[in-house]
Every structure is written in structure tokens, then in C-alpha cells.
Amino acid sequence: MRLGWKGIVGAAFGLVLLAAHTTAPRSAPMEPTSPLDKLVGRWVGEGFLGIKDGKSEAVKCRVTYIPAESTHQLKQTVRCASAGGSIEVQSHIVYSAGAISGSWSELTRNMRGDLAGKVTPRGFQVMVTGTDLNANMNVVINGPKQIIEIQFNNSSLIGLTLVLTKG
């Protein structure tokens, strides 16, 4: 079954954004650190995309985080593939005072949008918006694992659940 690219783009972006948050450090460091620090590197994983007609499709993703201009910013690249196709999303993520914000673009379909969210005790909550995309995401960080859940609004897609592993 072919999924709409808007849904796949949203799902991939959701993964990226959700992965962009980690919990605050447990020990008091001498210098301020960012909850984004633990994200730097490569994450891979898979999950399922739920569709309103009751079907689901397997999805595999690779997410790479590179430090940007400051310790509170990251550049992110997300590549996901399913039977319905593939996407590539690039994002710029900023952390400030417990909040996450930024922008994203899907390179092959020329889609763009914004993200905004907050840090939670176990990860973060984020809202992803774009011209034809609205989604709510929750991310739970547990050591080298990220569990990402995305709920799509006004879409033929219901949601996306992914498990990513750092390495």
C-alpha cells in the first residue's frame, strides 16, 4: 500500500523532533549543558505507520544529529523508507529554557514547516506544523533508546510509533 508523502514526511519529521529532546543531566555540571548533547551522532530504528483504513506499514529510519552554531542547537537529517517510498528531512533545532523550537524542510517534495515543544521529565512533547501537516509527538528517552509516538491531525494517517537506537 502506498502512503501519502505528506504523512511519511510528517512521520519522519516527528521522529526527528521527538528524538531531539533528552532529559536534563542528573548531576550538576560546572558549565551549562544542553539536553540536545546526548543526541549528537547516528540513530537507527524501525516502527509502524497506522493508516485510517485499518492498515499499517513498516517504516525504517536513520537520523543524524550534528552540533550547530552553539551547544543549544543541532542540525538534523532524517531518512526514512517504507513500501510506499522514502523521504529526506533536514531540520534546525534550538533548545532554550526548557523549550524546543525550529524549522524543517523535506528536500524531495519541497515541504517546509516549524516545530515547537517542551521538555518533559521523560523526554519531550512537540507540535509539528506545515502547509499540509499538523502532528503531535511524544518522545521518551531511555538510555540509548528513543520511543517516538506521533499522532496526526486531519490526515489519512493515524500515527507513527518508532524505536530508535543510538549507534
Language-model-detected regions and their locations in the chain:
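Preference for long, well-ordered alpha-helical segments
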Residues: Q146-I148
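Bacterial N-terminal signal peptides
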Residues: G10-A20
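Signal peptide processing junction and immediate N-terminal pro/mature segment
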Residues: H21-A28
